[in-house]
């Protein structure tokens, strides 16, 4: 008699591993479990144990051998890996976490051998979740992976096996189903920043200081030589006051510089990949006396979504306040006229009031010139890049296959159907802009204030140490015309002051104006010795006007530069591929009719849009030039061709290629250009589809030259029973 024994075994295994590596540590764990149930028909027991698993075999003398088991199994694993690395400059740390889950349900059969067995079922599931984080000096990078896969196998087997050999009377059926999906999500963020700012206050240029010193020399020289050494105290006071004024000006208003830089890069990337596959397969293989049916179905889809954003910015701005602005020359002219007027109208023999007025006027002239028109420089830069990219890829495939292969005495049908869809959507936006503004005329050097101070001290030293009206000159070879005018003016002033101090009793002195610049002042009151000269009687006024005009021309140059440039680009791309196919194939013996049909169709569209705009503007001010440049672009092209049907009959403009040559028409498209001038917006819009393929389909034994409509952008391959093969490939411009 049969001995029925029920045995239940459960094995639980936990494994933990720890490992160390360079500058990091890792930990790995896994958990697994297994359970099996066996039925055996033998009095003797043979058991084996190896590596945590147990196996039991049953034998019944060789007459009958049956094995029934229930084998469910589950397993899981989780890993954690951390890496803190300081030795490498780019990476500060890295952490990775991975979690895997595995489940499996093993095949099982009933424990009673005398009864009809239940279907054997098997299945498995696997999941994987991963998260990675990386911290570096440039930012944080996060990425993750997630995948899951499952399968289920069902084998309904009803069979009675004996030694009598009647296998042909037993039907067999088998079905298998599987499905899987995969997802990948990745997100990356990168941020980088720096800042730059430049500020500086320049000092008067050497050229301006020379002009000012020459004019000051021509004014002070006659005062010193007018009354011998009687004005030494006033000159000393003037020297001390000017030094006292210039020293804090050099120290406090010296060149300063502050530097900082700001630039930003921001990148965000998101990607999603999805893959789904479902398949059902049913296979039946029997003897020739039994009909057989085979059905296979598969479904697959794949999706890819990618989103990327990139942003980069920088800014630049340069602004400078000109020392040679328009109102500065006016201030210089007005103050110089006041100084000369006071010197001219000074009472004879006493120039102390004139010196005091000169000191006040010089201070009044220099202070607004330095404070209001002092050189300042502020620098900043702005430029921006913005890029956004989005991509979506979708792939879907559905297929149904039915295969039957029997003997010649049985009809067979073979049907295959497939459906495929692929989508690619890509959106890209790129924006780039830059702006630059430069204002201010830089006529200053670093050592200009030192040169100004040294030259002024030399002049004052000569004024103080001059013996009784003789003052040595400071050689300035430049500006010969200015020197001659100043010397002429100084001669007029010296002659006027000397004659006013020595000849107070001259009653009526008429003034004359000649080319040599001789001055005979007219005194209204000879008793008090006061002198006055009207504007019409001043013989040196013309020379002074020439001096002021020359100084204004040299001193009043202004310049303003402004430049703005920008570029904006935006592109959008969409790719859609759809393929629907139905294939019916029957291949039997010669006694059975065979039919074959193949149909395939798929539109493919490629839409690309690009918009680009570039502009620049430049402005230069200061009385010289003003220039503005507008955007200029070219290349505007739009083509559209490639309709459904025979490409030999429908060819769009710009299509090059042989017509009706062979079984495949290929072509390309010419790109045109259009120059719209100096001010235009440019863009290109291309909508094109490539070449199609022709296929010959035949039934029976003779080939057919039937031309089926082929969709553009679709390639196919059809094999006919006669052995003739046609192929085609897509070509997209």
Curated annotation (Swiss-Prot):
Q: What is known about its processing and modification?
A: N-glycosylated.
Expression by tissue: Detected in terminal tubule cells of the submandibular gland (at protein level). Expressed in submandibular salivary glands of 3-day-old males but not adults. Expression in adult submandibular glands is restricted to females. Isoform 5 is expressed in both 3-day-old and adult sublingual glands.
State the compartments where it is located: Secreted
In this chain, composition skew of type Low complexity spans: 256-270, 376-390, 563-574, 609-619, 677-701
Keywords in alphabetical order: Glycoprotein, Secreted, Signal
Region called Disordered, residue ranges: 48-91, 172-204, 249-330, 369-450, 496-733
| Protein species of origin | Mus musculus
Gly residues: bias regions: 654-665
Name listed for the protein in its UniProt record: Submandibular gland protein C
């Amino acid at each position: 008699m049969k001995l029925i024994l029920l045995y239940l075994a459960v094995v639980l295994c936990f494994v933990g591993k720890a490992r160390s590596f360079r500058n990091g540590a890792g930990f790995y764990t896994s958990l697994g479990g297994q359970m099996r149930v066996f039925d055996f028909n033998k009095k003797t027991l043979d058991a084996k144990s190896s590596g945590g698993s147990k196996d039991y075999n049953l034998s019944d003398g060789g007459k009958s051998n049956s094995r029934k088991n229930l084998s469910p199994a589950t397993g899981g694993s989780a890993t954690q890996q951390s890496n803190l690395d300081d030795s490498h400059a780019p990476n500060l740390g890295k952490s990775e976490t991975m979690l895997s889950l595995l489940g499996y349900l093993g095949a099982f059969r009933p424990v009673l051998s005398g009864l009809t067995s239940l279907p054997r079922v098997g299945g498995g599931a696997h999941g994987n979740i991963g998260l990675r984080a990386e911290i570096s000096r440039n930012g944080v990078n996060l990425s993750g992976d997630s995948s899951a896969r499952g399968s289920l196998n069902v084998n309904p087997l009803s069979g009675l096996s004996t030694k009598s050999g009647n296998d042909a009377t037993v039907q067999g059926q088998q079905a298998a189903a599987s499905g899987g999906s995969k997802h990948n999500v990745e997100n990356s963020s990168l941020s980088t920043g720096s800042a730059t700012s430049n500020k500086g206050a320049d000092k008067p240029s050497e050229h301006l200081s020379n002009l000012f010193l020459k004019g000051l020399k021509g004014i002070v020289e006659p005062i010193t030589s007018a009354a011998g050494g009687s004005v030494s105290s006033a000159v000393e006071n003037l020297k001390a006051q000017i030094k006292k004024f210039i020293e804090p000006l050099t120290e406090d208003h010296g060149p300063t510089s502050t530097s900082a830089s700001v630039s930003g890069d921001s990148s965000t990337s998101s990607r999603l990949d999805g893959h789904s596959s479902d398949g059902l397969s049913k296979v039946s293989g029997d003897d020739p006396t039994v009909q057989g049916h085979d059905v296979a179905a598969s479904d697959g889809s794949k999706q890819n979504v990618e989103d990327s954003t990139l942003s980069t910015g920088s800014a630049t701005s340069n602004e400078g306040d000109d020392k040679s602005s328009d109102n500065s020359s006016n201030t210089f002219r007005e103050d110089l006229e006041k100084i000369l007027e006071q010197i001219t109208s000074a009472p004879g023999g006493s120039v102390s009031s004139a010196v005091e007025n000169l000191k006040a006027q010089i201070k009044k002239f220099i202070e607004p010139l330095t404070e209001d028109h002092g050189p300042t420089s502020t620098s900043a830069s702005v430029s921006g890049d913005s890029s956004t990219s989005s991509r979506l890829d979708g792939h879907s495939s559905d297929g149904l296959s039915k295969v039957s292969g029997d003997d010649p005495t049985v009809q067979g049908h073979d049907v295959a159907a497939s459906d495929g869809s692929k989508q690619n959507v890509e959106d890209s936006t790129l924006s780039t802009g830059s702006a630059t503004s430069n204002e201010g005329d830089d006529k200053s050097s670093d050592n200009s204030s030192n040169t100004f101070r040294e030259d002024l001290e030399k002049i004052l030293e000569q004024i103080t140490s001059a013996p009784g009206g003789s003052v040595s000159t400071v050689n300035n070879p430049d500006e010969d015309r200015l020197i001659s005018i100043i010397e002429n003016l100084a001669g007029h002033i010296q002659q006027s002051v000397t004659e006013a101090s020595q000849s107070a009793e001259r009653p009526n002195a008429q003034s004359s104006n000649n080319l040599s610049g001789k001055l005979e002042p007219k005194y209204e009151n000879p008793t008090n010795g006061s002198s006055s000269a009207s504007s019409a009687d001043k013989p040196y006024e013309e020379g002074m006007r020439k001096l002021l005009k020359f100084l204004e021309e040299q001193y009043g140059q202004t310049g303003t530069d402004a430049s703005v440039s920008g570029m904006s680009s935006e592109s959008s791309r969409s790719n859609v591929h759809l393929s629907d196919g139905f294939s019916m194939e029957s291949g039997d013996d010669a006694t059975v009719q065979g039919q074959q049909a193949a149909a395939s169709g798929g539109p493919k569209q490629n839409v690309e849009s690009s918009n680009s705009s570039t502009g620049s503007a430049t402005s230069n001010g200061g009385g010289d030039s003003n220039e503005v440049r507008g955007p200029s672009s070219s290349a505007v092209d739009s083509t559209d061709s490639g309709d459904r049907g025979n490409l030999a009959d429908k060819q769009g403009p710009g299509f090059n290629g042989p017509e009706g040559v062979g079984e495949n028409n290929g072509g390309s498209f010419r790109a045109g250009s259009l120059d719209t001038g100096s001010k235009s917006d440019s863009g290109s819009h291309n909508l094109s589809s490539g070449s199609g393929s022709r296929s010959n389909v035949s039934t029976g034994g003779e080939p057919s030259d039937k031309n089926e409509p082929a969709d553009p952008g679709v390639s196919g391959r059809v094999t006919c029973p006669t052995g003739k093969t046609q192929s085609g490939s897509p070509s997209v411009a």
